[in-house]
Amino acid sequence: MNISYYTIQAGLNPAVGFGYAGKNIVKSLNNLGHAVSFANPKSTIQLNFTQPHHFKLHRSQYQIGYTPWESTSMRLDWVERFNACDEVWATSDWCAQVFKDNGITKPIYVYPHGIEDIWKPRRRVVKEGQPLKFLHIGEPSPRKDGQLVVDTFIKLFGGNPDYHLTIKAHKFNTTRVYDKDNQFGSPEIAYGNITLITDELEETDLVSLYHSHHVLLYPTWGEGFGFIPLQGLATGMPVISTYDWSHYMDYMGPLKLKSKLTDETLPKAVGDEHIGKMFRPDAKHLEELMREVSYDYKAYSGYYFAQADKIHEDYNWDQLTKKAFEHLVEKFS
């Protein structure tokens, strides 16, 4: 089948979610024998994978509108653009329900993202003399709440060499703390057991970063899909994350982080303003889970490692893509 793929220029960058997902969508379509071109009005179908106001809707072409979203409300012009498509795709059941609740009337299908083989499971142990290493990825997005991670880590383990926190930021970091001299600055300057990484990493280096850490901390207010927790889970890593938004919540396990659906606004210093409600992470529960996993790491490590192979089976890109396009293959064959 001839398929046109469309996104904006920024959506081609594999260092961000749209680009990373898009790369794998196109690759899996090619693996399945489909011919994929870019913004081609002559193709039978066009998959628009970007924010709805950027959709490129050619006439006389079957149009699919596909985007992730993180809150309970959407812009009215987004709803109009979705309804101008022939069908709409969502990245999770939660996201699909949000689309329906906001007035999208076209058929809605769920096409979750997948995981690549490179995210291999690894059994993790804390060796004698080695610190328990926590990892947070997502700065500078306020939605990923890196500040909550830093504040909680310092409260529990600040300055304790038996514990370490790595903050992996995309180019820059917004988390701030006061040091012993009451100076306000970046946490890795004030605490010797906190490390900051701002460089963009190749995928192999990113996988190695996951493999070299013991616990992923991800108190997000919501995700369109949530690659970061899925990648951690696929490597067998214990993950502390909110989950109500998640397509893969069944794999979140005993470290699921409680949250509350609220209309409290996020900080607006970085990123787009979100309207509607989002899932505010429970700060006290995050503290409890971090203590719990540090007390009994061996048990949690075993639990999450044991389910990793099943995650790779359920979130295989080729299988997910084949299922998503089955009704279109039947319709246009």
Regions found by a protein language model. Give the residues of each.
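N-terminal pre-catalytic "stem/leader" segment of glycosyltransferase-like enzymes
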Residues: 1-45, 49, 327
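Short hydrophobic beta-strand element within catalytic cores of glycosyltransferases
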Residues: 238-242
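Nucleotide-activated donor-binding/catalytic signature segment of Leloir-type glycosyltransferases, i.e.
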Residues: 177-207
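Short alpha-helical donor nucleotide-sugar binding micro-motif in glycosyltransferases
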Residues: 207-213
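Aromatic "clamp/platform" in nucleotide-sugar-dependent glycosyltransferases that forms part
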Residues: 221
